[in-house]
C-alpha cells in the first residue's frame, strides 16, 4: 500500500467517525422497500441513477467500487444482486457489514484501492457501481482499465465524478462566497497547495484530492474499451453550483 492510499484510508476512517454524508448507512425501511423491488441509488449527491441504466438486477454480480458506507451495496443486495463492496476504508466497509447483519443481507466486502483490482479475476462482474470517489486517486486511468478488465463482456460501468472546474478556485475565498481562479487542471493537493497546507491536511487526517481532467474521466473510459451510453449532471455543495453543475455521471458498456 503506497503512502497516498494509506493516508486516504485513514482519512475516510475519520470521515466515518465524524458522520460525513457519504458514510451514513441507509435506514432499515430503505432496505425493506428494496426487497419489494422499490429501490434507487445515487452515484452523485442529488440525483438518482436512472433505473433504465440497469439490467434486471436479480442475480447480477455487482461490484460497488470505492463504494463503502452502507449506501449503494446494501440496497442492491436487498434488490437481489450478488454484491461485492470494495473500499479503501475499513470503517466504510463496516457500515456495509452492519447493514448486512441488521437486515439479513449477504454482502462480500474487500479492503483495497479502486485502481488495483488484482484480487478479482477477469470478467467477474456484470455491473460496476462507482460513486464519486476517483477524486481520491492520483491517476484515474488505471481505475477505468481495471474496471474494464473485471467486467464481463457487455458489462455496465456506472460512475459518478467531480467536474474538475471546482478545483480552479481558491478554497478559502470560496468559503466566503468569492470565486477566484487560482489553480489549473489537472489539479493535485500535494503539488498545488502550499507545503504547510498539505502538511496540515496530513496531520489532521484529511483526505488528499485530485482534480482529473474531463478527458481522463470520459476519454479515459473510451480508451479503456468502453462505449459511453448515458450521461447526466448534478449539483452538490459548492458555491459554483449556482453557475454550473459540479458533478457528472456516466453509463458505459464494455465491448
Swiss-Prot record:
The keyword Secreted does not apply. GO terms for biological process: methylation. Keywords: Methyltransferase, Transferase. Coiled coil: none annotated. InterPro entries: Methyltransf_11 (IPR013216), SAM-dependent_MTases_sf (IPR029063). It holds the Pfam family Methyltransf_11. One of its GO terms (molecular function) is methyltransferase activity. Gene3D superfamilies: Vaccinia Virus protein VP39 (3.40.50.150). The keyword Acyltransferase does not apply. It comes from the Bacteria. Belongs to the methyltransferase superfamily. This is Uncharacterized methyltransferase YbaJ. The lineage of its organism: Bacteria, Bacillati, Bacillota, Bacilli, Bacillales.
